[in-house]
Amino acid sequence: MSDPHAMQRLCGLMRKAVQDYEMISPGDKIMVGVSGGKDSVALTIGLAQLRRYLGFDYEVVAVTLDPQFDHQAVDYSPLAALFARYGVPYEVHRTEIGPIVFEYRQEKNPCSLCARLRRGALHTAAQELGCNKVALGHHLDDAVETFYMNLWREGRIGCFSPVTQLDRRGLTLIRPMLLATEHEVRCAVKEEDFPIVKSRCPADGVTVREQTKDFVRERCRTDHAFRQKTLHALQESGIDGWRPVHTGRTSNPSPKEGMHHADAEL
């Protein structure tokens, strides 16, 4: 079903997250790590559009680290054309991450090594471009899944933070789409007909996260407020960085509100 306001709704949720957690300041230069998937593409365009509503200016640049799985470079020209329309400079860095992970190292857990290599390369690229912040495309589903993965696999209560300081790098990681569900991101991308570059990772779709995603999806069939309840628990749990900076403002005042988001309009 078509939703002509999907992108506006997503930008509203991004604006709320940015304000609740003070993610962006005047003069910031923000780099978005673009994989080519729906999340990073939506994040890039959302940040570009938010410049009209936040009341101050900041720069947005986008970088793709092509892992070159099977030694094959990917064509990212559709993304380059899209970002150019929104005034976002875009670079593609060809890397050997794919061959290192799947051929030279032949890791039993390829996702862990791949994530470390990509993270290091991404942070280096941000420093080289003179950026002080890196925006990541994690949404609410990612946070919920990470929370339960940590609980089940490691027996601990924890999750990545909305804002993370990397003191040694002089960088700050921000996650502006944290209040939006994956469905809301998908609807925005579909409605705007943004181009997507499909992942060619050999491990795509067979990870532990995919299993956790299935669990969350199943729970939401019987409890539509499951994601929002988990978000509320994260914000009230005392986990570093999760309580909104502005006292008295939470992104989900009551789990009973289900899938409705407060103050999400631009």
Each PLM stretch: what is its role?
Residues 1-147, 153, 183-191, 259:
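ATP-dependent adenylation/nucleotidyltransferase module used to activate substrates
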Residues 115-126, 163-169, 216, 220-236:
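Short, basic, helix/turn surface patches
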Residues 60, 133-134, 141-218:
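Catalytic subdomain that performs nucleotidyl-dependent activation
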Residues 4, 8, 41, 116, ...:
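Electropositive phosphate-/nucleotide-binding environments in soluble metabolic enzymes
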Residues 194-266:
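The feature marks non-catalytic terminal segments
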Residues 22, 26, 156, 160, ...:
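Residue-level signal for secondary-structure boundary elements
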Residues 67-69, 97-99, 164-167, 180, ...:
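Residue-level detector of flexible, active-site-proximal loop/helix-junction positions
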Residues 107-111, 136-138, 179-183, 221-225, ...:
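A general structural signal for short secondary-structure boundary/capping elements
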